[in-house]
Amino acid sequence: MEASPLFRIPKPIYDTFSPDAEIVIFHGDVKDFIRQVPTGIVRLIITSPPYNLGKEYEDRVSIDEYLHEQASVIRELVRILSDDGSICWQVGNFVEDGEVFPLDILYYPVFKQMGLQLRNRIIWKFGHGLHASR
């Protein structure tokens, strides 16, 4: 009997789009990447967009402007998504004047307008981060 390897040799992981790539992990501005991708070919999109908190890597804008900008990104993601594809959209909270706004609730109408259906909602509760107490 021949022994099988514990882990199979993984498929190559690319950092730029290629029609032959089965796995692409892109780190950067999605708008720079998405223009390269043909319509309807992506089966799974996993992303964690900026939360509009005004961190050093993002500019803080009004929540309406933020959602408008993200809607343009979502529109392009829907364009490249295959008919049997899924989007996993990981977001946190937007905070303004001490009030917490769960971003997933604000995004829901945007996804619905683009014909997508919510299939699952996962809430990760943890005791550290932006709003944790000591």
Residue spans for each PLM region:
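Core catalytic lobe of class I
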Residues: M1-R134
